[in-house]
């Protein structure tokens, strides 16, 4: 994949995420999937809608009986495959995601219709949860 005479080596998407239930529920799994350009990268099974302690970054006005934090997940696509937190998910490399065929990169995080665990999703941004970041899309050349 080449963009302006540079070769793309890696695409990474990271975000603090967890399941979603009313208020919070420590036993509430959800199969959370990432797609790039409408091609599935992989699914992570979130174990919980995390609560029971305050998120490290949550503002004072955020009620303690609500979801508090998530887990920082990192999807990565390289030439030799697709990975989640360093573990290989598949052999699907950069070419499969048609990145050079478009003027943009589409990223979707959600729950598949046929997911075994349809426990919803919370996506945290900078200032909430435990990690001081928004959703990050990183391209490495």
Model-identified regions with their sequence ranges:
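Hydrophobic beta-strand residues in large extracellular and virion-surface proteins
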Residues: 34, 105-109, 137
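Short, flexible coil/linker segments at or flanking structured domains
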Residues: 20-22, 95, 125
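Extended, solvent-exposed segments with strong compositional bias
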Residues: 47-100, 117-119
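Extracellular and analogous surface-interaction loops
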Residues: 1-9, 94-100, 141
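Mid-protein regulatory/catalytic core that forms ligand/cofactor-binding pockets
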Residues: 1-63
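Proprotein-processing/basic-patch segments
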Residues: 112-141
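Short, well-structured beta-strand segments within conserved domains
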Residues: 11-13, 93-95, 101-114
């Amino acid at each position: 994949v080449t963009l302006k005479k540079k070769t793309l080596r890696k695409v990474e998407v990271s975000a603090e995420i967890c399941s979603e239930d009313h208020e919070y529920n420590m036993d509430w799994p959800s199969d959370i999937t990432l797609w790039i350009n409408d091609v599935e990268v992989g699914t992570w099974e979130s174990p919980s809608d995390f609560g029971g302690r305050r998120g490290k970054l949550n503002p004072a006005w955020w009620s303690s009986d609500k979801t508090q934090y998530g887990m920082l997940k990192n999807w990565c696509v390289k030439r030799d495959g697709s990975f989640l937190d360093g573990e290989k998910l598949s052999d699907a490399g950069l070419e499969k995601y048609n990145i050079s065929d478009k003027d943009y990169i589409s990223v979707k995080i959600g729950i598949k219709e046929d997911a075994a665990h349809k426990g919803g999703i919370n996506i945290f941004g900078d200032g909430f949860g435990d990690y001081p970041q928004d959703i990050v899309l990183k391209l490495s050349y």
